[in-house]
Amino acid sequence: MKKFYFILVAAAMFVAVDAKAQLGVGVGYNLLNTTTTVADESESSSLNGFYIEAEYNFNLLDEQWGTLGIQPGIRYTFAGEAEQEEVLGIKTRASLTEHYLDIPVQVKYGYEVISSKLNINAFAGPVFSIGLASIVKGSTDDSVVKTNAYKDSDYGRFDLKIGVGVGVDLFEKFNVKVGYNFGLLNRYTGEQIDEYKYKIHTGVFYVGVGYNF
């Protein structure tokens, strides 16, 4: 048993020393997709938005067939929409905004096409998602109603997603990537009726650019 622990510690020290770490930051566009299912009927809606992120790239292996590493990060995601109508001379305004804090932990494979100039990569892994706020706001010239879905309805703020994507690194400094995070958990937290199962699943498509320090 002692020998086993010694091997684990030695392996961890080797990885810590051998791994090449690199900090990166990025911004981009995202499309938040929500699918609501009641019984056998589904309805989907989408919100446009943006994200800001920071990530750390740990290259664990660097071989002729490519590189393999782990890429943990932290990402702020915003998405929303607003609309305005006039009914019987009264202007009504409604808006929905979603704020998320995402923690992706990706396994990343890269292949160098042109030395120090062009690297293509693919990545996949879990994304731990925390809903910070889901604000629904309605107003007229005389009144304003504002609710937070996480506090005022049966909408869960936590989600576990599986993220997949591909990207390109340019000159070891710049990167472009596109991906999708598939939500696994049912975000509806209320009481269920057998004949009318209620489900809410969210997913996020994104495309962005980044800079590696």
Model-derived segments and spans:
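Residues that define the transmembrane beta-barrel architecture of outer-membrane proteins
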Residues: 21, 44-50, 97-103, 156-162, ...
